[in-house]
């Protein structure tokens, strides 16, 4: 990993009505890291992730977000240069974000739209390079046999793997995954997390993933950032996140819901 962060968040705040979703959050993400964002519901995890991609504007003020050294947003306004960052950032949502009536192949091939004319892509006139990259990505995530099927006929796990494949066709250098396993059964969830971990370790992709499942955060991610009421309350190695801190983050009920063998 290099010392220069690929993502930099400085004093980012976001208010919805009277609720402070983010409260002066600062964070650097280095190239090749796999980071879990954890915290109770409403702690600001998804708001932070969407703000990093410029999908959510932060409040006016001193807050600023950069990606690859270029501006994403600052002082309550998304930069007019944000597209330069977005073409290298793959965003994976909880609800899969696939077009149900299109085949899985077409959904994944749409990742190339930043490099080919939009009309060509919308008509499905994919150049050979895109076709080859799409099949390679589908094979990489283990769903190539479903390439011709409509996305809405696939299971949630298959669709989520398709969303990851689309990020590969996009040639993303960073994957932002917002609760990617929240809607999946345990087997599918583990498979998705294993794929993200493999892309991080084998391909050097930077991954930032929001998770409700603390055990997945500790198992698959080297670094954990915890938010509580919009504030960053932990940022460090997963191996050092102990029971006492987790109870502080989630409350006393954490003892009752956490899996057997939790950190001491």
Swiss-Prot record:
Domain ABC transporter: 7-254
Binding site for ATP: 39-46
Residue ranges crossing the lipid bilayer per the database entry: none
Record has NAD as a keyword: no
Subcellular location: Cell inner membrane
Pfam families: ABC_tran
UniProt keyword terms in alphabetical order: ATP-binding, Cell inner membrane, Cell membrane, Membrane, Nucleotide-binding, Phosphonate transport, Translocase, Transport
Principal EC category: translocase
GO annotation, cellular component aspect: plasma membrane
Molecular-function GO terms, alphabetical: ABC-type phosphonate transporter activity; ATP binding; ATP hydrolysis activity
Listed EC numbers: 7.3.2.2
Catalytic reactions of this protein: phosphonate(out) + ATP + H2O = phosphonate(in) + ADP + phosphate + H(+)
SUPFAM superfamilies referenced in this protein's UniProt entry, alphabetically: P-loop containing nucleoside triphosphate hydrolases
Membrane topology: Peripheral membrane protein
InterPro entries in the cross-refs: AAA+_ATPase (IPR003593), ABC_transporter-like_ATP-bd (IPR003439), ABC_transpr_PhnC (IPR012693), MetN_ABC_transporter-like (IPR050086), P-loop_NTPase (IPR027417)
Keyword Cell inner membrane: yes
Stated family: Belongs to the ABC transporter superfamily. Phosphonates importer (TC 3.A.1.9.1) family.
SUBUNIT field: The complex is composed of two ATP-binding proteins (PhnC), two transmembrane proteins (PhnE) and a solute-binding protein (PhnD).
Free-text function comment from the UniProt entry: Part of the ABC transporter complex PhnCDE involved in phosphonates import. Responsible for energy coupling to the transport system.
Protein name: Phosphonates import ATP-binding protein PhnC
Gene, per the UniProt record: phnC
């Amino acid at each position: 990993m290099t010392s220069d962060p690929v993502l930099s968040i400085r004093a980012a705040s976001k208010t919805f009505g009277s609720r402070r979703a983010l409260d002066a959050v600062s964070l650097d993400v280095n190239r090749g890291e796999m980071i879990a964002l954890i915290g109770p519901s409403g702690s600001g995890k998804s708001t932070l992730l969407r703000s990093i991609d410029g999908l959510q504007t932060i409040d006016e003020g001193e807050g600023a977000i950069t990606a690859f050294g270029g501006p994403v947003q600052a002082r309550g306004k998304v930069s007019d240069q944000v597209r330069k960052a977005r073409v290298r950032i793959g965003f994976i949502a909880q609800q899969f974000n696939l077009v149900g009536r299109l085949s899985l192949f077409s959904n994944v091939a749409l990742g190339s739209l930043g490099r080919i004319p939009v009309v060509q892509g919308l008509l499905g006139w994919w150049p050979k390079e895109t076709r080859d990259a799409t099949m390679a990505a589908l094979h990489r995530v283990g769903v190539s046999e479903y390439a011709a099927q409509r996305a809405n006929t696939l299971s949630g796990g298959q669709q989520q793997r398709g969303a990851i494949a689309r990020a590969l066709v996009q040639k993303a250098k960073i994957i932002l995954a917002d609760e990617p396993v929240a809607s999946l059964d345990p087997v599918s969830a583990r498979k998705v997390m294993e794929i993200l971990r493999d892309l991080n370790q084998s391909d050097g992709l930077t991954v930032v993933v929001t998770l409700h499942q603390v055990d997945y955060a500790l198992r698959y991610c080297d670094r954990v950032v915890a938010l509580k009421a919009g504030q960053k309350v932990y940022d460090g190695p997963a191996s050092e996140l102990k029971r006492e801190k987790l109870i502080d983050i989630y409350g006393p009920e954490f003892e009752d819901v956490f899996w057997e063998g939790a950190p001491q």
